[in-house]
């Protein structure tokens, strides 16, 4: 497993001074362009969650859609999209959350999940954790069970893992920067 996570980490790009000076952007594009690295990422996550009765992957907009859809296909379960406002037709359930400078909202279709669902939240990167705490609250409001939140990359210095722990959301990351 350690070898797999090292290979995955090595396939993630680092772009200095993007989107602004002093920031190092962790770019998943090289991982996605490398079929071996992408397959390894999905297979590593699949191994972790095999046999846990996951019925739905809750994929967080937008890059979570990539990993969440591939993982759901590999595991034989469904995908529930967690989107920004105005992106889903029909009736939606909403969860507001605070950002550093303002607020935002996640939405999902009103009847996307039931109390019988065991849900894995999937996103590409864990930074501050605010979006995933909101995702967990949104999922739980449907009566579904959140098994864990899974990420390809974590930036521990931004406190996301601590925030998730405080909110009672277990998390797993493949690699840290």
Swiss-Prot record:
Record GO terms (molecular function): adenine phosphoribosyltransferase activity
Pathway: Purine metabolism; AMP biosynthesis via salvage pathway; AMP from adenine: step 1/1
Subcellular location per the Swiss-Prot or TrEMBL entry: Cytoplasm
Catalytic activities: AMP + diphosphate = 5-phospho-alpha-D-ribose 1-diphosphate + adenine
GO annotations of cellular component type: cytosol
GO annotation, biological process: adenine salvage; AMP salvage; purine ribonucleoside salvage
Broad class of the protein's primary localization: cytoplasm
Keyword terms: Cytoplasm, Glycosyltransferase, Purine salvage, Transferase
Listed EC numbers: 2.4.2.7
Entry-linked SUPFAM superfamilies: PRTase-like (SSF53271)
Major enzyme class: transferase
Family that this chain belongs to: Belongs to the purine/pyrimidine phosphoribosyltransferase family.
Function as written in the Swiss-Prot or TrEMBL entry: Catalyzes a salvage reaction resulting in the formation of AMP, that is energically less costly than de novo synthesis.
Oligomer and partners: Homodimer.
Name of the protein this chain belongs to: Adenine phosphoribosyltransferase
Gene: apt
């Amino acid at each position: 497993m350690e070898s797999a996570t090292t290979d995955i980490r090595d396939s993630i790009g680092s772009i200095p001074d993007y989107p602004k000076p002093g920031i190092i952007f962790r770019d998943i594009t090289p991982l996605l362009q490398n079929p071996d690295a992408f397959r390894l990422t999905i297979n590593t996550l699949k191994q972790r969650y095999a046999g846990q009765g996951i019925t739905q992957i809750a994929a967080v907009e937008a890059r979570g859609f990539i990993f969440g859809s591939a993982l759901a296909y590999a595991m034989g379960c469904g995908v529930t999209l967690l989107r920004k406002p105005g992106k889903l037709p029909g009736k939606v359930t909403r969860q507001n959350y605070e950002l550093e400078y303002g607020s935002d909202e996640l939405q999902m279709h009103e009847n996307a999940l039931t109390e019988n669902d065991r849900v894995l939240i999937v996103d590409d990167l864990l930074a501050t954790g605010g979006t995933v705490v909101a995702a967990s609250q949104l999922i739980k409001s449907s009566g579904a069970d959140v098994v864990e939140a899974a990420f390809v990359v974590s930036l521990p210095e931004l406190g996301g893992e601590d925030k998730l722990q405080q909110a009672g959301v277990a998390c797993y990351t493949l690699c840290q920067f």
